[in-house]
Regions:
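Long, contiguous interaction/recruitment modules in multidomain scaffold/adaptor proteins
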Residues: 90-223, 238-249
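Canonical positions in the second alpha-helix
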Residues: 211-212, 245-246, 279-280, 313-314, ...
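Structural marker of alpha-solenoid helical repeat scaffolds
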Residues: 215, 249-250, 282-284, 317, ...
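Canonical tetratricopeptide repeat
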Residues: 191, 225, 259, 293-294, ...
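Helix-start (N-cap) detector for alpha-helical repeat units in TPR-like alpha-solenoids
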Residues: 186, 220-221, 254-255, 288-289, ...
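Secondary-structure boundary elements
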Residues: 37-99
Length: 367
């Protein structure tokens, strides 16, 4: 045997050994390292990895046949979730991958948590993707609570493909932003905090939102919600400072500005608040959610006709948003026109039969 042949055999053996020892990159462990960099190892150990799978899920995935094509594996993941688990939509609470698998229910982010975990387990490289041109506003007591809309995404042949829980719902999405796992985890905790906030549980809301702001200090949605918690807790000055911090990160963000105006009102600075709200209205002429918010505020102060003006503007911007039609339901109820209220309620439910507010109004109106 020549020296060259011997070297070639040694190289082949080394390569074979390396291939045998290959393991996929542990994204859950890496995310925990990222947590530890921000908040320390001890606290990081208590933070959930939303896409992490347990032994039961991994065992189920072992029954799937291996497939070489990425597209076929993506279809396999969707079939596993929807045909195998028969996942059903449930608005709240947001769940991690393991809990979504266990209950077979979840919302859009719950689905993405499970999709990402399962897809990575079968050798794919999906990511969380934020839909940046759909910024839904949830508001209570004149303040806006921030929640982003997240879908799963993966590049195939250089093109980003996205996967959503409700693919049959009308999609007006145009702008997508893949985000890293730290930001995705912050979205998860922000969702939990927002759900608690909208449900009136300020203690849990503060706990969840604080986690989001600590692991992702520049995550503006969680910063906004922290300000709302402070304002609700009787700390408008702290809330104002929090909104200012958020605006330093995201200048011109309308959600932060609207909430800042509310804090200014609480501090007795009505002139500054009115000036800021006028600026927001001038800059948000294409955002239907802003006009829905303004209509709700107008109803709250007893000006149903002004609320109707706002909702007409929202309807002109997007007549296929269920929230627009639900806003018209509220306006026409305030005006005492039950016929039109029922008409727009039916339209809202046709566009989104899962909308919890619409379902509550349906019960109220006997539909």
């Amino acid at each position: 045997m020549t020296r060259f042949t011997l070297r070639l055999l040694c190289l082949s053996a080394a390569l074979a050994a390396g291939c045998a020892e290959y393991k996929p990159f542990d994204t859950a462990a890496y995310l925990r390292q990222r947590y530890a960099q921000e908040i320390g190892a001890q606290e990081a150990a208590r933070i959930a990895v939303p896409f992490e799978l347990n032994a039961e899920i991994r065992g189920s995935l072992k029954t799937l046949p291996p497939l070489s094509s990425e597209l076929r594996r993506i279809n396999q993941v969707n079939d596993f979730i929807f045909d195998g688990l028969k996942l059903q939509y449930s608005l709240t609470p947001t769940k991690d991958a393991a809990e979504t698998y266990r209950t077979r229910t979840g919302n859009c982010l719950s689905f993405v948590n499970l999709f990402v975990g399962v897809a990575r387990e079968v050798g794919l490289n999906p990511s969380y993707v934020e839909v940046t041109d759909l910024q839904k506003w949830n508001h209570r007591e004149g303040m806006v609570v921030s929640q982003g809309h997240i879908v799963a995404g993966m590049y195939l042949d250089g093109e980003l493909h996205t996967y959503d829980f409700l693919p049959d719902r009308r999609k007006a999405y145009r702008e997508f932003k893949p985000i890293d796992d730290v930001t995705a985890a912050a979205h998860y905790y922000n969702n939990l905090g927002a759900e608690a906030l909208l449900g009136g549980d300020l203690a849990r809301a503060r706990e969840m939102i604080t986690v989001a702001t600590r692991i992702a200090p520049r995550f503006d949605k969680a910063i906004n919600n922290l300000g709302v918690i402070q304002a609700r807790g009787g700390e408008p000055q702290k809330a104002l400072e929090t909104y200012q911090r958020g605006l330093a990160i995201s200048p011109g963000d309308p959600t932060l500005q609207v909430n800042m105006a509310r804090a200014l009102q609480q501090l007795g600075r009505s002139g500054d608040a009115d000036q800021l709200l006028a600026k927001v209205e001038a800059e948000n002429t294409t955002n239907p959610f802003f006009f829905i918010y303004e209509a709700d505020v107008a109803i709250g102060r007893g000006d149903a006709n002004k609320a109707l003006d706002y909702m007409v503007r929202a309807l002109r911007l997007d007549d296929e948003l269920p929230e627009v039609h639900l806003g018209l339901v509220k306006v026409y109820l305030a005006l005492g026109d039950l016929g039109k209220a029922r008409h727009y309620l039916a339209r809202s439910l046709k566009l989104d039969a899962t909308n919890q507010d619409a379902l509550r109004y349906a019960k109220l109106l006997g539909q």
